Amino acid sequence: MRNLRLGTRGSQLALWQARHVASLLESSIPDLKVEIKTIKTTGDKILDVALSKIGDKGLFTKEIEKELLDGEIDIAVHSMKDLPSELPPGLCIAAVLEREDPRDVLLSHKNYSLADLPQAALIGTSSLRRIAQLKAWRPDLQLVDMRGNVETRIRKMKEQDLDGIILACAGVKRLGLEEMISDYLPAHLVLPAVGQGMIAVEARSDEQDVLKLLSRINHQDSFLAGQAERGFLHELGGGCQVPVASLAELQGGQLHIRGLIASLDGKEKYSGSSDCSPPEAEEAGRELARSLLQQGGAAILCETRK
């Protein structure tokens, strides 16, 4: 019997994702036993400051990646959207599971749909990407900074009597809370974060036997979409502190990728799309990013990062 040590954050959602990966591996590989190790990250420790103000990449991954590089664990499981656009030397994304619904959703204990939200509604979110796009759609919305895991945010929504909160659909569904969803935010209204809805499995680049094991659970269409979106993000040098978004989808054998750069107040935004063959996924994402930078996105990002 072979043992595989899996590192993950300790939130309910992170543990769900880790157990899901472990289950897939154990069911596809006889005599494999996966041990789960929880690791606390910087992002888990700093809960009273907006992510955009901490200003560090890898907030939810750095400590896990250190243990991976040091040989303390064999693989790491992440929400793809938490991974920095550039991985540490010696590490790679070895597998991506089939993508869950990438959209954002509205949760409202007052049962508001998007169309029902009152003037100056109080909406909780800490994402600059969501804030910029929501302001572009409804400048009247009062956006309240909100950090914490899914359960914490739901509790804060009720305690602070907010009209709603915006979360990633995937996390809500994976925790079995789908009945709490009041409405879905279409991608043309709020484009998702890079990698939203994807579970990524990271490994050491030189561990060929581990890479081979992980290839058994890889979903190639999702992997390619992730490459395109991460290519877009990498070209922008992005992370949690910049209001950018991207979504890639395979349609009829072609990869369709959309991208967005927006100002924090939602008054300026540059968006575009392109199509490519799957082998060109990453470069297509980079090329789309370069196009948006030239249109005016570079000035927005420069201003945002001041």
Swiss-Prot record:
Biological or metabolic pathway of the protein: Porphyrin-containing compound metabolism; protoporphyrin-IX biosynthesis; coproporphyrinogen-III from 5-aminolevulinate: step 2/4
Cofactor(s), names only, from the UniProt record: dipyrromethane
Enzymatic class: transferase
Disulphide-bonded residues: none
GO function terms (MF aspect): hydroxymethylbilane synthase activity
Keywords linked to the UniProt accession: Porphyrin biosynthesis, Transferase
Residue list for modification S-(dipyrrolylmethanemethyl)cysteine: 240
Signal peptide: none
EC number(s) stated in the UniProt entry for this protein: 2.5.1.61
PROSITE patterns xrefs: PORPHOBILINOGEN_DEAM (PS00533)
GO CC terms, sorted: cytoplasm
Cofactor note as given: Binds 1 dipyrromethane group covalently.
Keyword Repeat: no
BP terms from Gene Ontology: protoporphyrinogen IX biosynthetic process
InterPro entries named among the record's database cross-references: HemC, Porphobilin_deaminase_cofac_BS, Porphobilin_deaminase_N, Porphobilinogen_deaminase_C, Porphobilinogen_deaminase_C_sf
Reactions it catalyzes: 4 porphobilinogen + H2O = hydroxymethylbilane + 4 NH4(+)
Binding partners and assembly: Monomer.
Note: The porphobilinogen subunits are added to the dipyrromethane group.
The protein's role, per its UniProt record: Tetrapolymerization of the monopyrrole PBG into the hydroxymethylbilane pre-uroporphyrinogen in several discrete steps.
PANTHER family linked: PORPHOBILINOGEN DEAMINASE
Family: Belongs to the HMBS family.
Record protein name field: Porphobilinogen deaminase
